[in-house]
A protein has these predicted regions:
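Sec/Tat signal peptide C-region and signal peptidase I cleavage site
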Residues: 35-39
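Bacterial N-terminal signal peptides
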Residues: 12, 21-33
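N-terminal secretory signal peptides that target proteins for export/translocation
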Residues: 1-18
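Intrinsically disordered, low-complexity regulatory segments enriched
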Residues: 14, 24, 277-280
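Glycine-rich flexible loops
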Residues: 41-285
């Protein structure tokens, strides 16, 4: 072997060794990443005493409201625990469109997570806990930053029922102003005192607006609370359009609202099944 040939051979061998080492490092990283992914996807233990159908309702409700633009990266859907009325169910801090059944956690009414396991929770969980404390009849709470509703939360124009689907609004829609009792804040319901004040303004109504923030809709089921959150946004947009036409809109009376809302309860499954069909395929992605 000549000196020149030996030098070339040594250089090629060194290059091949470096490539092999890099390949080995890449393989090791991939294997480690695979182990990490497997650990991250470990199934969460089922919540005690909670039917899978209720978890699905929370998931479908979260995703359909995001799909309709009532929710975006913010907002949340909760349900009172079916066997422990002093607890409620709500997802970890996550964009509503991404919520799965495994993301749903259990909280007491003070907003303490029963089994956090390092998962981040929503700051505004106090909205839900304090309303469940104040309203034993409420089994579900939805908080949104509904674009249609915001103008009515900051103006003197009251939100009123325009047609039969949002007929529940005919009972009156109070507006909670955080600044009235708490001064200048970050506008978020980040503690029990704020949540209690909001719940007091909601009183016995199905919907309360939050000045410069959004709204809260409640109901005896997740389906009805989601229905109310959706149609509150629809009503707000239609009312803005009607006002823009000029003159005073012909709103539903309290009596019309009460009778029409009874029909909503009778047909809720019709629209819910449509929404469910629309959302369930996204859960496989």
């Amino acid at each position: 072997m000549t000196r020149k040939f030996a030098t070339r051979w040594a250089v090629k061998s060194f290059g091949a060794s470096r490539r092999l080492a890099r390949f080995g490092a890449v393989v090791a990283i991939v294997l480690l990443a695979g182990r990490a992914d497997t650990s991250a996807q470990t199934p969460v233990a089922p919540l005690a005493g909670v039917d899978a159908a209720l978890l699905e309702d929370i998931v479908v409700g979260s995703r359909i409201l995001a799909d309709f633009g009532v929710l975006d990266g913010f907002g949340h859907v909760s349900a009172r625990h079916p066997t422990n009325p002093n607890h409620f169910l709500m997802s970890r801090s996550l964009a509503p469109a991404l919520v799965t059944a495994d993301d749903i956690m259990e909280f007491d009414l003070d907003g303490n997570a029963v089994d956090a396991r390092g998962r981040t929770v929503f700051l505004e969980r106090f909205i839900h806990g304090e309303i469940y404390k104040a309203r034993p009849d409420v089994m579900s709470v939805v908080h949104t930053h509904s674009p249609g509703v915001i103008p009515f939360s900051v103006s003197k124009v009251p939100l009123k029922a325009m047609f039969h689907n949002p007929s529940f609004l005919a009972a009156g829609v109070p507006v909670w102003d955080i600044r009235k009792d708490f001064g200048e804040t970050n506008m978020l319901v980040g503690n029990s005192a704020l949540g209690k004040s909001l719940a007091a303004t909601l009183a016995d109504k199905p919907v309360v607006l939050m000045r410069g923030h959004g709204d809260v809709a409640v109901g005896p089921t997740v389906k009805m609370a989601v229905f109310r959150a959706y149609y509150t946004d629809v009503n707000a947009k239609l009312q803005s359009q009607a006002i823009a036409l000029g003159g005073e809109p012909n709103y539903l009376t309290a009596g019309e609202g009460e009778k029409a809302d009874m029909t909503n309860f009778a047909v809720i499954d019709r629209i819910w099944n449509l929404w469910r069909m629309r959302i369930l395929p996204t859960l496989a992605k």
